[in-house]
């Protein structure tokens, strides 16, 4: 399923996936985004996936579940996932559920890309 609100840029094994939707609530959007992100993990061995959510204002619990599935897919390929641009209220949700220990969080996508370039897998 294609995801028309996801822009993907590749820099060798670093993949920037920018989510261009403010609210991730409906099942169709969540499914298509989750499938597109997992496909990137499957396509790129030792992926360093940066998910830029700077335009996202709300994540449903289902979307958080999809992000966990994306993390698992990346780990299967010996990769890693950073979430960039997460708003403080959304970051708090990850902390409450202790999922902040699962992901790397970066203030901006550019910082995540630079960090991953300095520390390749």
Predicted regions and their residues:
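Conserved catalytic submotifs in the C-terminal HATPase_c
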Residues: 20, 54, 110
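STAS-typified acidic loop motif
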Residues: 3-35
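Residue-level detector of intrinsically disordered, flexible termini
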Residues: 1, 72, 83, 108-111
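Short regulatory "switch" loops immediately downstream of catalytic or recognition motifs
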Residues: 17, 40, 117-118
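A charged, well-structured terminal subsegment
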Residues: 104-121
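Amphipathic alpha-helical interaction surfaces in cytosolic regulatory modules
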Residues: 23-103
């Amino acid at each position: 399923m294609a995801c028309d609100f996801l822009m993907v840029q590749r820099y060798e094994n670093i993949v920037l996936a920018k989510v261009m939707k403010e609210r991730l609530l409906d099942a169709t959007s969540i499914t298509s985004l989750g499938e597109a992100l997992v496909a990137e993990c499957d396509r790129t061995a030792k992926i360093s996936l940066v998910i830029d959510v700077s335009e996202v204002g709300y994540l449903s619990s289902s979307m958080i579940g999809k992000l966990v599935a994306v993390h698992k897919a990346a780990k299967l390929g010996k990769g890693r996932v950073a979430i960039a641009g997460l708003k403080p209220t959304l970051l708090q949700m990850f902390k409450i559920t202790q999922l902040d220990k699962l992901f790397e969080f970066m203030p901006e996508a550019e910082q995540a890309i630079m960090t991953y370039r300095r520390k390749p897998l």
